Amino acid sequence: MKNLLLALLLVFLTGCIKKLDTDGLTLKIDESELNKSSKEFPMKKNFVFANIQLEKPYIFIKDGTNRINAKIDISLSTVFMPSSFGTFALSGKPYFDKEKKAIFLEDVNIEELEFSNLDLSKNFTNMIMSNMKPVIDNIFTNIPIYEIDKSSFKGSFVKDVKIENSELLVTFGL
């Protein structure tokens, strides 16, 4: 029984450990970890002429980039057009906040916005995207994409967070 437990522990750890060297211990954070459910979603925002609802984002790393990407389903209702449903894609750079023991996104860019039942002009789409930018920035500076257990000491030892070969890597060290 003890050998079985040790074997399972080794299999688990080798799946997460990316490398161990003089920089420290580097762990790979899987997409499944990034996509754990958040109690913050769905999120509703009400504006003077429009209301939006954002569903839980699907977070992933696009090959060949050093950014984390997300696709978010959106519901939009305005005074001057019918309710619409769509998706938008965004990307941002990961950073670690030692105080909150969590990984957030900064330098967030809205890459794409599409609605299934609307054919919007490029100018109107750009206006929506520019008005949504502060909302999106606020979301990803306040809601982490990954948290280290608050009761764990690991958050104190995070040295680096980066994307390499389409993997999110967290390096722990002194």
Where on the chain are the PLM-derived regions?
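Tryptophan-rich substrate-binding surfaces of secreted polymer-degrading and adhesive proteins
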Residues: M1
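Extracellular/lumenal and peripheral-membrane lipid-interaction modules
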Residues: C16-L174
